[in-house]
């Protein structure tokens, strides 16, 4: 190998150190993308990361999305800092839904009460991002309400068990009809024009 080639390889080699932020699901860290290649470029053992992350989250319900910071040291070892579940996870759990609205602003995917929002805010107030800046609870509440809006979740003052059950029943009927419509549209679509499906569903 020429001296120039060795210099070029050295220059292209990713630097060790730094912090990688990602959302990783509890107990489900795997060597593949998107995190695997990023860690590999830093010289970090992705298999070791997966083993350590999955071990640290073994007592948490599998699949819960967890904000994770990976502090990479100069010797290419690392430290993990695993945060609490995301706001969107808490909101969807409180609303009893798996996904947000397909068309935000045009449909309501779920309902949560203000009590739910304040409970989530009190939990998230312990997050480093909020705690270190001493963010007021009222600001966290507003942030959560904004997240709810983006998911198509409506925040109401009060919400009884019966009201929630009635809404969920109505929502299930809506989703079933939507699924049928998508299937019908898909049968009519030319295979070369997949984008048309999303356009027609929004109309």
From Swiss-Prot:
Name this polypeptide is given: Large ribosomal subunit protein uL11m
Keyword Ribonucleoprotein appears in the UniProt entry: yes
A GO cellular-component term linked to this record: mitochondrion
UniProt source species: Rattus norvegicus (Rat)
The protein's assembly and partners: Component of the mitochondrial ribosome large subunit (39S) which comprises a 16S rRNA and about 50 distinct proteins.
Gene Ontology process terms (BP): translation
Gene: Mrpl11
Subcellular location: Mitochondrion
Superkingdom in the source lineage: Eukaryota
HAMAP family: Ribosomal_uL11
NCBIfam families noted in UniProt: L11_bact
Keywords per UniProt: Mitochondrion, Ribonucleoprotein, Ribosomal protein, Transit peptide
Family as reported in the entry's similarity comment: Belongs to the universal ribosomal protein uL11 family.
Entry-linked InterPro entries: Ribosomal_uL11, Ribosomal_uL11_bac-typ, Ribosomal_uL11_C, Ribosomal_uL11_C_sf, Ribosomal_uL11_N, Ribosomal_uL11_N_sf
MF GO annotations: large ribosomal subunit rRNA binding; structural constituent of ribosome
